[in-house]
Amino acid sequence: IDGGNGGLREFFAHDWTPYEGEKGRIMEPGHQFEWAWLLVRWGSLRGNEEAIRKAKRLFEIGEAYGICPRRKVAVMSLYDDFSMRDGLARLWPQTEWLKAAVRLASVTDGEERQRYLASGLSAIGALQPFLDTPVKGLWFDKWPADRPMLDEPAPASTFYHIVCAIYEAEAVLAVHE
């Protein structure tokens, strides 16, 4: 996790410094959400408030900078200054957004909890266009920034993201009803 901006980069050199050049500046909102989810789970199990604090920052980055204002979906990548790098949206980051939001809601209360729950609802809304396909049970994987969903085969690797998001939402919300 970057000590300056609190975000997680995608590419590193062998000594864990950011990879040189443009590649070393890339941050994916989907991975900010995914690592927020991992850290809040680990932090809550271990009683590690620092991990939960870092999880909240990763989530904040994903939510504040990684959501396309027009389409309301998490995009593919940002630069380390949080400017847009690639506005393509894929299905899997929406699931990670949902997982992180509901897990963070589970370790917070009051207005903060309500904010994470509202964000989870936004993540569900972001999933909807990807699931609105002519063939029930399939999904669109990619939504370019400047055109409709790509009509291409649905990758099977996306299915576990969908199932895990459903499981996480159900598990967390069932305990906290």
Task: Report residues per predicted region.
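Glycan-recognition and catalytic cores of secretory/periplasmic carbohydrate-active enzymes
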Residues: 1-177
